[in-house]
UniProtKB/Swiss-Prot annotation:
<keyword id="KW-1133">Transmembrane helix</keyword>
<feature type="transmembrane region" description="Helical">
    <location>
        <begin position="137"/>
        <end position="155"/>
    </location>
</feature>
<feature type="transmembrane region" description="Helical">
    <location>
        <begin position="8"/>
        <end position="24"/>
    </location>
</feature>
<feature type="transmembrane region" description="Helical">
    <location>
        <begin position="64"/>
        <end position="81"/>
    </location>
</feature>
<keyword id="KW-0813">Transport</keyword>
<dbReference type="InterPro" id="IPR023380">
    <property type="entry name" value="DsbB-like_sf"/>
</dbReference>
<comment type="function">
    <text>Required for disulfide bond formation in some periplasmic proteins. Acts by oxidizing the DsbA protein.</text>
</comment>
<dbReference type="InterPro" id="IPR022920">
    <property type="entry name" value="Disulphide_bond_form_DsbB"/>
</dbReference>
<feature type="topological domain" description="Cytoplasmic">
    <location>
        <begin position="1"/>
        <end position="7"/>
    </location>
</feature>
<keyword id="KW-0997">Cell inner membrane</keyword>
<keyword id="KW-1003">Cell membrane</keyword>
<feature type="disulfide bond" description="Redox-active">
    <location>
        <begin position="94"/>
        <end position="122"/>
    </location>
</feature>
<feature type="topological domain" description="Periplasmic">
    <location>
        <begin position="82"/>
        <end position="136"/>
    </location>
</feature>
<dbReference type="GO" id="GO:0005886">
    <property type="term" value="C:plasma membrane"/>
</dbReference>
<keyword id="KW-0249">Electron transport</keyword>
<dbReference type="InterPro" id="IPR003752">
    <property type="entry name" value="DiS_bond_form_DsbB/BdbC"/>
</dbReference>
<feature type="transmembrane region" description="Helical">
    <location>
        <begin position="43"/>
        <end position="57"/>
    </location>
</feature>
Amino acid sequence: MKNSRPVLFAVALASLLLLAVALYLQHVENMLPCPLCVIQRYAFAAIALICLVTAFRTEVTARIGAALAALASLAGAGVAGWHIYIKAHPTVSCGIDPLETSLNTIPTAKLLPFLLQADGLCTTEYAPIMGLSIPQWALVWFIVIALFLLHTAFRKKS
């Protein structure tokens, strides 16, 4: 039987590294996160948490965890896709005002404001990183992570 634990640890590590990159961009490069960015951060955090918790359980639980984390990744991909659409159509609003958002009143945002507080606007343009915008990179990573997790969750037992 193949072990899901290495994949879950790798995905958790990748998700935590992506959150670290987000913190670097926010605090060093002064790229303020918008509400959609923060929702994507929640998705990466959920993926990491689910993977870490279920990696220490039985193989069946690890596979269930991989499926749940894949759902979180697909949800994050949906948010990233919406964010890309908004950036491509500046007249469209994300519908979330960062100054009045209930997103900033969630207990985790109060506990970790340096990571989960939305201060920027969804349509703010920042310089691309290696040719892609931040939401485009997030979408790429959400898809890659989802593919690994779906393969782990649904592969045949050997």
